[in-house]
């Protein structure tokens, strides 16, 4: 699949960040977890009751979504309709479910 233009990628990444935000809100509500979500442009910050954070941002030059969590830094690249970790091959929402659950100290399922 050919690379997207920067504007195409930013539009796609923006829609994905919208989906992530909605998924985190729904999962937090379902688990009665307190997660503060803030977003500025292509950067989303999730802040948990224990003070820990997860940062998710789009990297247009690399055409990736980057996730910084307590457990490490992860890069996700689009593969068809999915975003997959460039090292482990994990799908974005499965991976985010694990990171968010760890930091919220509650079982949350995104996606």
Swiss-Prot record:
Q: Give the matching Pfam families.
A: Frataxin_Cyay
Which family does the record claim for this protein?
A: Belongs to the frataxin family.
Q: PANTHER family per the record?
A: FRATAXIN, FRATAXIN, MITOCHONDRIAL
Main role? Involved in iron-sulfur (Fe-S) cluster assembly. May act as a regulator of Fe-S biogenesis.
User: What is this protein's gene name?
Assistant: cyaY
Is Transferase a UniProt keyword of this protein? Answer: no
The organism of origin for this protein = Cupriavidus pinatubonensis (strain JMP 134 / LMG 1197) (Cupriavidus necator (strain JMP 134))
Gene Ontology molecular function: any one: ferric iron binding
Q: Which UniProt keywords apply?
A: Iron, Metal-binding
What is the official name of this protein in its record? Answer: Iron-sulfur cluster assembly protein CyaY
Query: GO cellular component terms?
Result: cytosol
Can you tell which superkingdom this protein's organism belongs to?
Bacteria
* Biological process (GO), any one: iron-sulfur cluster assembly
